[in-house]
Structures are given as structure tokens and as C-alpha cells.
């Protein structure tokens, strides 16, 4: 398959273009685009929805073979409303970072969320800001390079 070409731009796509498991979905995107977003947004309670180590190896082969780049979207199934939620998020992200590290993603995208503030127009409290800043420091420290964290 020939990649889509847009002059002076790199075309990107998510690993959810197909309703498929990780490997065929990444293959589909990498065959067509320059950059693939590996979406690992809901790992599950026991990481049962994450790609397996074998799938990660195959994803690495696909990305290299297609000369594509890759970035990872980190879990979103926890939040920063409470310190407990932030701690849960750190644990999930640490597991994803360990799993995907061999892929050498150029960035790890984190969506910082405060569900208690949805629709209120409110800002995070000073306490929420404090534990979020601490969580972000811990998250950045578990990545292959802290500057790869994109918030």
C-alpha cells in the first residue's frame, strides 16, 4: 500500500482506525500514514486490555518496516480529582511506559482530567494542583526521557 502524501506535512492516524486488535490496527495505520498514535487509554483493572509483550514486538517491526514513527496515548481510565486517583494513574502509566519503552515512542500523551469540574467552569483546587504536579513529576520520571511527556 502506498502512503498518503500531503506536501510539507506528516500524516498521522490512531491505532483505532479499525475495530481490530492492536497489531492489525497499527499495521493498517502505519501502511497509510507517517505517524501512528498507539492508544492504550483503558488498560483495565488488571491490565487485561493492554497489548501483550509479543504484540509490542510485532508493532515495533511494523513501525520500523513502514518507516513510520509512533507516539503513545496514556491511560485515561483514572483521573486527578483525588490523590488516590492520581496514584492509580501513576501505576497504570508506569506499566504502559515499561511495556512500550522498546518501541521508542517520540512522545507519551497524557490527558489530565478532573471529572468533578466537568461543566462547572471551575479550576482545580490548590490541593488538586499540588498532587497533580507531583504526579506529573513521577510520571515523567518513569518515561524513557521526561521531555517525551506531552500534556
Question: What do these predicted regions represent?
Answer:
Residues 1-95:
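N-terminal pre-domain/capping segments
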